[in-house]
C-alpha cells in the first residue's frame, strides 16, 4: 500500500479537530464572562512557557464559541480542520463558499495571543477593511486588539499604532511597502513594523504565485530624463521578428539575435553594442523591444487622454498613478507617441516571495492550489492540503468545446448566454482581457441581453456586482478573476434552473486560474455548471502551440469555404482539446520557470538588502560611531591613495571636492606621490584639520555622535538607492540576452556582486564627504542644523 503524506497529515489534524469539537458542548455552558476570561488564562499559560501547539485545542474551542455569540456563526467541522491545517504552516485548499473568512478567526486568535505581529493578508483593500470591522468584533469581544491596515479614502493612518494591534487585516502591497519605508527612516523609533510573526494569506495563489514577479518598488529621486527613448523606439520598429530578434516560447520575453545586434551595429556605425561603452544605449534598445513586442495595448495597459495607464492583470482595473520601473513605462509612452513622464530612481525594492519568507510562520487559503502544490512546497516550503467540503460538490464541469476560429466561438457563446437569459438563469462570463470583455459586451447588447460588465470598477462596487451575480436573470461579464473573495449566492428560484452557469471564453495561461473560475459555481452544495468555449486562435494557443496548429486552423477555415465543414460546428474528438491543453501546460510551465528565475534573482538582491537593512538598524541604534567612521576613512583613503598614485592633479581635485573645500596646495610635496602610505598619511592629516574645524561647531560628544550618525546613514542611503536602481536596470538587460548564449541568473549575480563593491566605495566616499564638507549652522538654542553637500 502506497504511503500518502497528505492523507497522513489530514488524519493527524482530524484527530485534533475532533478534540476541539468535543469541547463544544462544555463551552456552550460558559457565561460570556467565563468565556472571555479564557484569553487571559491562555496568555498566562504562554507567559509560563506553554507553546501555541499545547493550547491550540482550548484556544480554538474558545474562539469557535465566541464566533457564534458575536457573529451568529459557528465554524463547521471542515472549517475547524482548515484552521488546524493553517496553524501548522500549510496552504488549506477550501472551495468557494466554504467559509474561509470564519476559518481564519481560529489561527489568528491563537497567534494573536502572543501579541502584535499577526496579519490576515488579502489583495483587496475593501475586503481587508470589511473583515477587520466585521470579524474584528470577535477578537475585541475576546480581549484582543484588531485593526485594518488600509485606508479606503486616502485618510492618513497612524501605522505605528495600527501595527501595535494583536491582529491586523491588510493587503500584501500595503504591508510590503510599509516594510520598505521602515527601512528609509532616519530614526529607529520611526519604524512602524516591529514584528513579523504570522501571516495568513487569503487567495494565497494570487499573492504568492500570480503576483510573484511584480516587485514592490518605492520610487523617488528623479532621474535626468533620457532622450534615447524616442530614437530607440524608431529603430526597433524597423527590425524583423525572428530575424533581428526572437521571443521566448510564451511570447512574454524577447531578445536580440546575433544577426540583430550585427544589423544594429552596422546601422549605427559602432562596434561592441553590448559592451560597457554602449550599455545605456543598449538598455534603451531592450526597453523599446519589450515595449513594442511584449507589452500589449488593452491587455497590459490602455491609453486614455494621451496617458498610458497600467491594467491590473487580475481584474482589468486601470491602475492610476502606478508606473512600470526601470524605464519600461517611458518606452511604452514613446511607442504610443504620448508625452514621456518623469523617470524616477528605484529607492527600495522587494518581491512578495522574499517579503513573506521573512515571517516566522506563513500559511494560506485558496480554492485553487493543488495544481501548483509542487511550486508552493519548493519555493515557500508550504504543503497544500485539500479540505473536504461541508456538503458534497454537485457542480457539473463540462469538457471544453473547441472551435476553429474566434468568430465561431463568440457566436456559440452568445447562443448559450441567450438560452440561459431566456429562462432567467444567471451566467458569469469570463474573458481574458479588457478589450475582449468590451467586445462580448457589445455583442450581447446587439442581441438585447442586459448585463453587468465587471472591469475597472471600484473594489466596493465590484464586490456588490459579484455578490448579485447569482440572482435570477443576472448576466455578468468579468475580466479574469475580478471579484475574488466575494461569494456568489444564488437568488430565489435559481437552484431549480440549474444554478449559476459559468462560461470561460478562453483558457488562461494557468489551469489553476481556470479552476478559480469553475469554483464560482456550486458553492456549499448548490447546483451549478461550468464550461469553456475555446478556439484555435485564442491567445494561449497562438503563443504556445507548435507552428503546425496554425496551418491546421487555416485548413479548417478552407474546409468551410469548400463546403466540407459546417461553419460554427465544434471540432470533434480529443485532438483539438489536446492542442489547447498542451498549449496551456506550456504556458504554465514557462510562467513557473519565470517565477523561479525571479526568486533566484531577488535572492541575490535579498542577501544585499538584508545586509544593508541590518547595518542601517545598527547605525540608528548606536550611540558612538567614531570607531566605525575612522575605519571607513581608513579604507577609503587607502583606496584613493592606490588609485591616485603619481597623479597630482587627480589627488588635489579629490581633496577639494571630498575633504576640504578650502584646501590650499601651497604645502603640497609631489614626492609623496611615490608612496601609497605617504598619500594616505597626507589625506588623513588634511581630514583631521578639517574635522577640527567641524568640532568647533559640534562642540560636545553628543552632537558629534549625532552628526556621525546622520552622515553615515545619509551616505548609506544614497549608495543603496543607487545600487537598487542599478539592479533594476540590470535585470531588464540580462533577461533580454539570448537564453542560448547566456544564463540570466548567473550574469545578474556576477554583475550584482561587482555593483555591490562599487556601492561600498560610494558609501565610503559619501561618509567622508558628509562628515567633512557638510555645512553646520548653529541655532540660537544650542542646536545645530546640518546641510549636506
UniProtKB/Swiss-Prot annotation:
Signal peptide: none
Main location: membrane
Assigned keywords, A-Z: ATP-binding, Cell membrane, Cytoplasm, Membrane, Nucleotide-binding, Protein transport, Translocase, Translocation, Transport
Reaction(s) the record says it catalyses: ATP + H2O + cellular proteinSide 1 = ADP + phosphate + cellular proteinSide 2
Top-level taxon of origin: Bacteria
Similarity comment: Belongs to the SecA family.
Protein role: Part of the Sec protein translocase complex. Interacts with the SecYEG preprotein conducting channel. Has a central role in coupling the hydrolysis of ATP to the transfer of proteins into and across the cell membrane, serving as an ATP-driven molecular motor driving the stepwise translocation of polypeptide chains across the membrane.
Assembly description: Monomer and homodimer. Part of the essential Sec protein translocation apparatus which comprises SecA, SecYEG and auxiliary proteins SecDF. Other proteins may also be involved.
Protein name according to UniProt: Protein translocase subunit SecA 2
Lineage: Bacteria, Bacillati, Bacillota, Bacilli, Lactobacillales
Amino acid at each position: 500500500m502506497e504511503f500518502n503524506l497528505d492523507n497522513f497529515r489530514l488524519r493527524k489534524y482530524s484527530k485534533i479537530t475532533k478534540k476541539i469539537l468535543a469541547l463544544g458542548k462544555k463551552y456552550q455552558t460558559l457565561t460570556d464572562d467565563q468565556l472571555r476570561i479564557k484569553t487571559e488564562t491562555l496568555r498566562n499559560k504562554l507567559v509560563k512557557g506553554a507553546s501555541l501547539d499545547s493550547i491550540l485545542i482550548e484556544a480554538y474551542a474558545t474562539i469557535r464559541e465566541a464566533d457564534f455569540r458575536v457573529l451568529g456563526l459557528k465554524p463547521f467541522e471542515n472549517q475547524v480542520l482548515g484552521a488546524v491545517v493553517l496553524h501548522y504552516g500549510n496552504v488549506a485548499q477550501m472551495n468557494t463558499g466554504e467559509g474561509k473568512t470564519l476559518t481564519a478567526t481560529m489561527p489568528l486568535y491563537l497567534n494573536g495571543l502572543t501579541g502584535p505581529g499577526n496579519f490576515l493578508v488579502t489583495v483587496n483593500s475593501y475586503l481587508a477593511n470589511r473583515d477587520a470591522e466585521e470579524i474584528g468584533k470577535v477578537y475585541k469581544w475576546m480581549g484582543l486588539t484588531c485593526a485594518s491596515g488600509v485606508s479606503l479614502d486616502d485618510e492618513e493612518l497612524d501605522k505605528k499604532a495600527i501595527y501595535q494591534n494583536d491582529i491586523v487585516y491588510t493587503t500584501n502591497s500595503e504591508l510590503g511597502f510599509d516594510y520598505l519605508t521602515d527601512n528609509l527612516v532616519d530614526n529607529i523609533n520611526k519604524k512602524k513594523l516591529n514584528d513579523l510573526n504570522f501571516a495568513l494569506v487569503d487567495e494565497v495563489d494570487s499573492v504568492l504565485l500570480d503576483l510573484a514577479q511584480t516587485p514592490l518598488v518605492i520610487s523617488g529621486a528623479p532621474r535626468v530624463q533620457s532622450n534615447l527613448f524616442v530614437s530607440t523606439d524608431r529603430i526597433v520598429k524597423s527590425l524583423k521578428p525572428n530575424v533581428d530578434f526572437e521571443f521566448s516560447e510564451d511570447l512574454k520575453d524577447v531578445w536580440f539575435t546575433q544577426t540583430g545586434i550585427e544589423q544594429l551595429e552596422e546601422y549605427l556605425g559602432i562596434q561592441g553594442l553590448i559592451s560597457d561603452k554602449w550599455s545605456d544605449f543598449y538598455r534603451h534598445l531592450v526597453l523599446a523591444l519589450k515595449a513594442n513586442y511584449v507589452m500589449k495595448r488593452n491587455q497590459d495597459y490602455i491609453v486614455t487622454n494621451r496617458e498610458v495607464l497600467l491594467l491590473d492583470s487580475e481584474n482589468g482595473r486601470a491602475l492610476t498613478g502606478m508606473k512600470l520601473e526601470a524605464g519600461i513605462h517611458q518606452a511604452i509612452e514613446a511607442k504610443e507617441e504620448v508625452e514621456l513622464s518623469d523617470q524616477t530612481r528605484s529607492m527600495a525594492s522587494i518581491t512578495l516571495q522574499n517579503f513573506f519568507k521573512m515571517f516566522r510562520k506563513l500559511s494560506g487559503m485558496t480554492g485553487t492550489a493543488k495544481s501548483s502544490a509542487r511550486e508552493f512546497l519548493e519555493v515557500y516550503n508550504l504543503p497544500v492540503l485539500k479540505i473536504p467540503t461541508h456538503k458534497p460538490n454537485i457542480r457539473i464541469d463540462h469538457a471544453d468545446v473547441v472551435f476553429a476560429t474566434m468568430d465561431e466561438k463568440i457566436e456559440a457563446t452568445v447562443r448559450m448566454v441567450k438560452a440561459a437569459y431566456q429562462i432567467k438563469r444567471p451566467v458569469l462570463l469570463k474573458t481574458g482581457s479588457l478589450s475582449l470583455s468590451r467586445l462580448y459586451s457589445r455583442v450581447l447588447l446587439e442581441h438585447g441581453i442586459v448585463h453587468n460588465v465587471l472591469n475597472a470598477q471600484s473594489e466596493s462596487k465590484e464586490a456588490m456586482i459579484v455578490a448579485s451575480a447569482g440572482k435570477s436573470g443576472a448576466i455578468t461579464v468579468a475580466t479574469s478573476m475580478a471579484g475574488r473573495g466575494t461569494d456568489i449566492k444564488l437568488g430565489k428560484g435559481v437552484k431549480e434552473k440549474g444554478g449559476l452557469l459559468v462560461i470561460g471564453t478562453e483558457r488562461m495561461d494557468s489551469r489553476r486560474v481556470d479552476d478559480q473560475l469553475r469554483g464560482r459555481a456550486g458553492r456549499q452544495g448548490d447546483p451549478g455548471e461550468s464550461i469553456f468555449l475555446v478556439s484555435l486562435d485564442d491567445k494561449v494557443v497562438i503563443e504556445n502551440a507548435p507552428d503546425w496548429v496554425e496551418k491546421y486552423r487555416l485548413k479548417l477555415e478552407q474546409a468551410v469555404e469548400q463546403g466540407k465543414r459546417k461553419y460554427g460546428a465544434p471540432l470533434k474528438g480529443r485532438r483539438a482539446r489536446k492542442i489547447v491543453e498542451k498549449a496551456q501546460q506550456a504556458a504554465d510551465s514557462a510562467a513557473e520557470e519565470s517565477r523561479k528565475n525571479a526568486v533566484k534573482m531577488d535572492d541575490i538582491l535579498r542577501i544585499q538588502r538584508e545586509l544593508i537593512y541590518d547595518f542601517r538598524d545598527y547605525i540608528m541604534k548606536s550611540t558612538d560611531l567614531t570607531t566605525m567612521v575612522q575605519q571607513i576613512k581608513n579604507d577609503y583613503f587607502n583606496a584613493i591613495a592606490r588609485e591616485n598614485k603619481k597623479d597630482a592633479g587627480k589627488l588635489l581635485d579629490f581633496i577639494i571636492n571630498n575633504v576640504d573645500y578650502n584646501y590650499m596646495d601651497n604645502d603640497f610635496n609631489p614626492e609623496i606621490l611615490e608612496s601609497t602610505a605617504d598619500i594616505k598619511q597626507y589625506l588623513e592629516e588634511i581630514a583631521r584639520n578639517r574635522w577640527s574645524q567641524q568640532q568647533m561647531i559640534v562642540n560636545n560628544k553628543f552632537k558629534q555622535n549625532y552628526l556621525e550618525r546622520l552622515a553615515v546613514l545619509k551616505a548609506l542611503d544614497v549608495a543603496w538607492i543607487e545600487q537598487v536602481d542599478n539592479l533594476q536596470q540590470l535585470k531588464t538587460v540580462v533577461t533580454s540576452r539570448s537564453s542560448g548564449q547566456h544564463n540570466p541568473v548567473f550574469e545578474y549575480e556576477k554583475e550584482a556582486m561587482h555593483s555591490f563593491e562599487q556601492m561600498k566605495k560610494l558609501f565610503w566616499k559619501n561618509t567622508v564627504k558628509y562628515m567633512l564638507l557638510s555645512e553646520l549652522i548653529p541655532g540660537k538654542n544650542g542646536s545645530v542644523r546640518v546641510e549636506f553637500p
